[in-house]
Amino acid sequence: MKKNFILNVFEKASICRHFENEVFKRVSKKEITFPVYLSAGQEYAPATIAEIALKKRIKPLIFGQHRGHSIYLSFGGNIIKLIKELKGKKDGCTHGMGGSLSIHSTKINMYGHDGFMGSNACIGTGACFSSKKPTIIFIGDAALEEDYVLASLSWVSKKELPILFVVDDNNYAVLTKKAE
């Protein structure tokens, strides 16, 4: 690997981690009063994938999970708009209506999560099937237990769609633990 690739990934991941730490502080001080879904500890997957996409000049459709701050920032989302979104401001990335859960930006092709666990797998699969554009879908380990996510994986395989599924194993799944 080239040195600048590794440094670029490190820089993206560091920005994401610092952002998450600052959000946590602001929530603790009640400066952010809306619910937030932090992704600290999960920043290297989106940082690495975003850097690969940048180097390969791929502008994928991105379907993030509810812990999407690092995804948004890694793929070039506007940090100021994200801060404003977390505060419910109209000039936030989702006009203050999506909050932490549903980060959306057509500028970076990122489509907000709707709140149903794993539903972004189905929505992203449909978007890819329709557009035939490279697509990245981020889900958590708990979402991988949902039947409709498994159906999406099957459909992607059958139709040979250009989709990368990224599963964040944060050990939050309640039905299937790693030990099993």
Residue ranges and their predicted role:
Residues 10, 139-140, 173-175:
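Short, contiguous strand/loop micro-motifs
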Residues 21-24, 29-159:
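Cofactor-binding active-site loop characterized by glycine-rich and histidine/acidic residues
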Residues 159, 164-180:
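Thiamine diphosphate
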